[in-house]
Amino acid sequence: KYVRSKTETCGYVAGISFVNQLGLTTQMPAIIEIVTNKEATNGRTITVGSQKVRIKKAAVAVSDNNAELLQFLDGIGQTEKYTELPMEETIDTMLSYVKQKHFTKEQLSEVSSVITGATAKKLIEWGMIYEFAS
């Protein structure tokens, strides 16, 4: 409901859950974090079955075209905090993800208003900015 409707993407899994999906940590969160268009508040916790889920409003409208990139950009900020791998391996994993997803400079430009200074710095320092296709 908060990630995908029948016809379109409206959110994404964020935080340590995403870092885990990338294989950078074995930690599993007690509360899954979801960023979604379907939330008006800056964050609230709900229970889905027996799982606690924190839903937060998206800073920019999430769509089929930008959900994975927004998720990745959010993840950059979480990687150093949660990774269990050496930094070089962590960066290689993130670079591989960018290549695999074929993110474009145009997609990055469309969400540039929500990229934090710290995230922009990591995109450049880690060399990921050069992996975005023209």
What are these regions (language model features)?
Residues 57-134:
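Hydrophobic alpha-helical interaction segments
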Residues 19-20, 29-31, 53, 60, ...:
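Residue-level detector of solvent-exposed, low-hydrophobicity positions
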Residues 33-34, 54, 71:
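Generic structural signal for residues positioned in beta-strands
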Residues 47-57:
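A short, charged helix-loop
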Residues 7-42, 47:
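Short gly/ser-rich loop at a beta-strand->alpha-helix junction or flexible surface loop bordering the NTP-binding
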Residues 1-3:
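Short beta-edge/loop segments at beta->alpha junctions of small alpha/beta modules
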